[in-house]
């Protein structure tokens, strides 16, 4: 893939400021040990997909607008009779962001989307998995500016997983705080 001339604001901030701050805080022996963002995975599960097979397609279109990249339709792995679910039925959409799109999405998430969430008091600082990855959920996808509120017939939630190269939660928490993640006190 060709390298573009455009560099994201957050990527530039990471290279110029955040790496130095992380090096001072944790005093790594090697520059490659400094944690960085690896990828962001956005998953949108559509629970009502069993009744209407068009809903995952609509959710995927909204997710494509939010992420700026075409999502993959996720399908059920096995049948569950209680949920009227058959193996192979479309049940949601997911997208994996890396590189410039990842940093651009993170910028919009932190500065635009999270402040628009109703009754937002900050992200849970305990939502790390023990290996340096952070997971969060958003109940309404309309907080993103790419979604036209008037054209939305149904609101969906989404899971956002921020994967870092950090080896533990403390390093990942420090990295995300440097990116101005609004953690709860």
UniProtKB/Swiss-Prot annotation:
It comes from the Bacteria. One of its GO terms (biological process) is translation. It holds the Pfam family Ribosomal_L5_C. The keyword Transcription does not apply. Keywords: Ribonucleoprotein, Ribosomal protein, RNA-binding, rRNA-binding, tRNA-binding. One of its GO terms (molecular function) is rRNA binding. PROSITE patterns: RIBOSOMAL_L5. HAMAP family: Ribosomal_uL5_B. Belongs to the universal ribosomal protein uL5 family. PANTHER family: 60S RIBOSOMAL PROTEIN L11-RELATED (PTHR11994). This is one of the proteins that bind and probably mediate the attachment of the 5S RNA into the large ribosomal subunit, where it forms part of the central protuberance. In the 70S ribosome it contacts protein S13 of the 30S subunit (bridge B1b), connecting the 2 subunits; this bridge is implicated in subunit movement. Contacts the P site tRNA; the 5S rRNA and some of its associated proteins might help stabilize positioning of ribosome-bound tRNAs. Part of the 50S ribosomal subunit; part of the 5S rRNA/L5/L18/L25 subcomplex. Contacts the 5S rRNA and the P site tRNA. Forms a bridge to the 30S subunit in the 70S ribosome. This is Large ribosomal subunit protein uL5. The gene is rplE.
